[in-house]
Amino acid sequence: MTYRVIQWSTGNVGIHALRLIARHPDLELVGLWVHSPEKVGVDAGTLAGIEPTGVLATNDIDALLALDADCVCYTATADLRPAEALADMTRIAASGKNIVSSSVVPMIWPDHMPAGLRAPLEQACEDAAVSCWTSGIDPGWANDLLPLVLSG
């Protein structure tokens, strides 16, 4: 089975995800969201430094969410904009797409996040019968333990 995937951003994490999605035999890149206007209309492969994919970058959220996709790989920066990132993710879930994310670090352990912040996303996932899975280097090994071990 091939999963149809939209990549959401081309930043520090997103660019690596984009390369891997584009080249994975079980994944089909069907859309790419970009923040920068100068990236709109550019082939995803060109942005990722790989062969062309035929998928053009866009900042048109409605058009992306109208695509037939199984999943969105959401890697937009959320450190300074967690409410906006959660709003994006809620909108994605409400469109019927599963989410895999490295953004909004507290979503790694959602029960430790204020219920008022996570409730809209959880409700959208439940209503659309989709999932949201967040993972990454935070919290734990790379940002918490490794610097402590290396400094000692």
What are these regions (language model features)?
Residues 133-152:
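Conserved anion/nucleotide-ligand pocket segment
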Residues 1-94:
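N-terminal glycine-/serine-/threonine-rich beta1-alpha1-beta2 phosphate-ribose binding loop
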Residues 22-26, 126, 130, 151-152:
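Generic secondary-structure signature for well-ordered alpha-helical cores
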Residues 86-87, 94-95, 103-130:
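Rossmann-fold NAD(P)-binding glycine/threonine-rich loop
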